[in-house]
A protein has these predicted regions:
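Leu/Val/Ala/Ile-rich N-terminal alpha-helices, chiefly Sec-type signal peptides and the beginnings
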Residues: 2-75
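Extended alpha-helical scaffolding modules
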Residues: 13-25, 30, 36, 109, ...
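Amphipathic protein-protein interaction modules
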Residues: 116, 134-174
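Residue-level detector of alpha-helical secondary structure
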Residues: 33, 64, 68-71, 85, ...
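Short alpha-helical "patches" and their helix-cap loops
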Residues: 127-143, 207-210
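Short amphipathic alpha-helical segments that mediate assembly, nucleic-acid/protein binding
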Residues: 13-16, 29, 66-67, 81, ...
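Alpha-helical oligomerization segments
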Residues: 155-212
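Long amphipathic alpha-helical segments with strong coiled-coil/leucine-zipper propensity
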Residues: 48-131
């Protein structure tokens, strides 16, 4: 009897703990859009980067960190693969659906394009089928014609999955193209943001019932 109870208790402890954690919601997205609408995207005199560009980078970091928190908790055994995918879907629906009207339409459209690699890489990581030879992958990606979007994204997502798994990328591969980056370079820039986010989440974990 006691042995059976111990086995049941042990099995229960082995199950991923369920969390009441809000990773990203529509209100958070809307607040960022409102802030960006009020920002000035023209650099002040003597400045190279405008207030709006700085905010846009922080916006990207916020989304990237929120998404990778989900994956990090999966790595910690807090979520099953199915739960992780469902939570990624929820955030992706907010981030990748629709565009604001006016001046921000093109800016947010470009942001959404760069964030394609974030969500695709996370799913590839969860599937577990990805190459870890970063150097070879970058070389392959840079050789793909920009019109071949799907193939380029597949390679970039492979790099991103390797980064989520612990590989380091991609500062040394983007420094030469930072002034005029192509789409694959934009994805490498986002993967660099992912790399930094994963480092910051090295000790991240949440207890059941905690919220953001």
């Amino acid at each position: 009897m006691c042995t059976d109870m111990a086995k049941k208790a042990s099995a229960k402890q082995a199950e991923p703990m369920k969390l009441f954690y809000i990773f990203y919601n529509q209100e958070r997205w809307d607040n960022w859009i409102k802030t960006l609408e009020e920002a000035n995207f023209e650099p002040a005199e003597g400045e190279e980067v405008s207030e709006g560009e700085q905010m846009l980078f922080s916006f990207t970091e916020d989304i990237t960190l929120s998404v990778l928190k989900i994956v990090r908790l999966y790595q910690n055994g807090r979520f099953t693969k199915e739960e992780t995918i469902a939570k990624l879907d929820d955030v992706e629906l907010i981030v990748m659906t629709g565009l604001p009207e006016g001046d921000l339409e093109e800016i947010i459209g470009s942001l959404q394009l760069s964030l394609l690699v974030l969500f695709t890489a996370c799913r590839k990581y969860l599937d577990g089928e990805f190459d870890k030879d970063i150097k070879a992958l970058v070389k392959k990606g840079k050789g793909i014609d920009e019109e071949n979007l799907e193939e380029a994204l597949e390679v970039a997502a492979n790099i991103g999955a390797a980064v989520v798994d612990g590989a380091t990328c991609c500062a040394k591969y983007i420094k030469d193209n930072v002034e005029d980056p192509g789409l694959f370079d934009e994805w490498l820039i986002e993967i660099e943001t992912m790399s930094n986010a994963m480092k910051s989440l090295a000790k991240f974990d949440e207890e059941p019932g905690e919220s953001s």
